[in-house]
Regions:
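N-terminal capping/lid subdomain adjacent to the active-site entrance of alpha/beta enzymes
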Residues: 1-132
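Generic hydrophobic alpha-helical scaffold/packing signal
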Residues: 124, 142, 154-157
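Catalytic beta/alpha-barrel core
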Residues: 75-83, 107-112, 135-149, 162-173, ...
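Generic hydrophobic/aromatic pocket-lining and core-packing "Φ" positions
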Residues: 63-64, 153, 176-177
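Short, surface-exposed basic-aromatic patches at helix termini and helix-loop junctions that form
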Residues: 92-100, 155-161, 178
Length: 178
């Protein structure tokens, strides 16, 4: 059962004894799922971002063209996690372009590079204050902590109070995900 892997918040009244992953899965899964388009950290958003070395393979290069061509509704934004001004600007630029193109959701992927939760909190709080529609469309925050959780434990409860968290490659040892 999950009790050997997940520890509930003290005083939450949650008990994982006798509970299994299947207990938390949707019984009648949807037939269709939205596709998430990854906006890489060096991907060109506008013509000003072009370097001249872009592929000439017939596929879009600029984000607005991708959105229009493929009807993108969900954008995963890769961030640096070490340059708050750049990360915030990237989220705003992608968010505005996405909203103009009918985006439903976006996510912020900090790529296991954040050294302190306040870094993410400050970006999220600024989005909430200055770009509330972009903040509202930010479905979750991915990897707001180091890859090696064992060696760089962070208390990210303050981040999860703002937005749900998603971890993938950091979750390679559940002993440290508590």
């Amino acid at each position: 059962d999950l009790a050997g892997f997940v520890e509930p918040e003290q005083g939450s009244g949650v008990d994982f004894c006798g509970r299994y992953p299947a207990d938390y899965l949707v019984k009648n899964a949807p037939v269709k799922l939205p596709v998430w388009h990854v906006v890489g950290g060096v991907d060109a958003l506008t013509a000003e971002d072009l370097t001249g070395g872009e592929p000439k393979d017939g596929y879009p290069v600029l984000l607005a063209d991708w959105i229009r061509t493929d009807g993108l509704k969900c954008l995963k934004v890769k961030l640096r996690g070490t340059d708050a001004a750049w990360d915030h600007d990237r989220l705003v630029r992608v968010g505005r372009m996405g909203l103009a193109g009918g985006m439903r959701w976006m996510s912020a992927d900090f790529n296991c590079t954040v050294g302190r939760p306040e870094y993410v909190n400050e970006i999220l709080d600024k989005l909430l204050r200055d770009e509330p529609e972009i903040y509202a469309r930010l479905l979750y925050v991915e990897q707001p902590f180091a890859y090696e959780l064992e060696h760089e434990m962070l208390d990210v409860r303050s981040v999860s109070a703002r937005k749900p968290l998603f971890l993938d490659e950091s979750a390679h040892d559940w002993e440290f995900v508590r």
